[in-house]
Amino acid sequence: MPEGPEIRRAADNLEAAIKGKPLTDVWFAFPQLKSYQSQLIGQHVTHVETRGKALLTHFSNELTLYSHNQLYGVWRVVDTGEEPQTTRVLRVKLQTADKTILLYSASDIEMLTPEQLTTHPFLQRVGPDVLDPNLTPEVVKERLLSPRFRNRQFAGLLLDQAFLAGLGNYLRVEILWQVGLTGNHKAKDLNAAQLDALAHALLDIPRLSYATRGQVDENKHHGALFRFKVFHRDGELCERCGGIIEKTTLSSRPFYWCPGCQH
């Protein structure tokens, strides 16, 4: 499943295609959304927001399209009039004079009023988004030490969208390697330096991935361009200590780590 950085880059692509342009055609597959088609003609997308792995498309009439791609959903940008050859099932079409965005295969799609936006179950449940520029390491540290999260093992905590939205498996693996911790650690057992390093890594690594992944220079480290240090690198040498990277399973997901320097 795509993680926060990939969802945000997808949102950027959608914004670049149709933001601010009047909608000339709107189509929804689901019957409960059909009544909104005419309401959106002539309106425009004001911005596309991400909340972890959910995407919120905001319109100028204050309606918001909520979509969660889950495992199979995917957005596509095409020139208006183009019909992609695909076996995927079309769910949403938002068309402007020159560009059209299409959502395929997703099943979790709703239209929300401003009031519903504040009470939506998923949006109420998710924690702060790691790509939110207003989220600080200090706030992350407070969440780590809160009664709700301080006794949780990182193996599960870093996959829990209620803790921080936008994290996923590759980020979990890379963050824990960066700070030299294992999935079995808990926030309550860390010293001040470890807590500080983890709070920064929980923001720095997702943001670096968002900014630079896809522009990878294999000779660069986390401080420059993003590349995987341990994810999918089992059997290779750890660049930090020379140990052998291993693969196991934690919280039902593949987990990669270096026993030589993560302890």
Swiss-Prot record:
Xref: InterPro entries: DNA_glyclase/AP_lyase_DNA-bd, DNA_glyclase_Znf_dom_DNA_BS, EcNei-like_N, Endonuclease-VIII, FPG_cat, MutM-like_N-ter, Ribosomal_uS13-like_H2TH, Znf_DNA_glyclase/AP_lyase
Cofactor dependence: Zn(2+)
Cofactor mode of binding and number, as noted: Binds 1 zinc ion per subunit.
GO biological process: base-excision repair
Keyword match Iron: no
Family of this protein: Belongs to the FPG family.
Name this polypeptide is given: Endonuclease 8
Organism: Escherichia coli O7:K1 (strain IAI39 / ExPEC)
Gene label: nei
